[in-house]
Amino acid sequence: MTVVCLLLWAASNPVVAGCFDKREAGMDWSGCQKTNKMLDESNFSGSRFDDANLALSSLDDSNFKGASLVKTDLTRATARRSRFEGADLTKSVGYRAVFDGAILEKTNLVKSEYFRASFRDARITDTDWSRSELGRVDFSAAQLNGVSFQYSNLSRVIFSETKLENVDFEGAYTYLTHVEKVDLRAVKNLSQLQLNLSCGDLQTRLPKGLWIPDTWPCEE
């Protein structure tokens, strides 16, 4: 009878995985509420944050290598100079988040939402950012190599002084996307229609076969 009672109690009182564990590599904060926390200079490598809420938290100079942040809420969080090599941020949300100087390599950001986020001076390599909402993201002075923006919303994104190598624009929405003074000759699957929607200038370098639209430079 005692065993049955213990089993019933355990079923009705599930333990939240690791929410009160101290921060360290390989921990599990899945589903945890960690809003407005000071978590700078943390080693979160290999840790799990799936469905966690990290909104408004400071995560600067932290290590997220191989971490899982699926459906994690990073709204207005900061992760300046943090490392996300091999991290999974599928369906994560980072409205107005700040990732300036961050390193993302082989990172999964499919179906994520980062409206008005900042990735200034970030280094982003071999990363899948397809089918995502990236309106007004600031990539100024960032280095992007092997990034897929396939079928993502890039409206009003800023690529000022951004280095773009092997970046895939197939099906991306580029309404008023800023490419002034940007070299686009090494990008992939960029169409004339996408250029017509975007904002560039006479210093924008275009791939072979494409031309400067009559609407450049934009008035806004």
What do the predicted segments below correspond to?
Residues 4-5, 15:
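Cleavable N-terminal signal peptides
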Residues 15-220:
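Tandem repeat scaffolds
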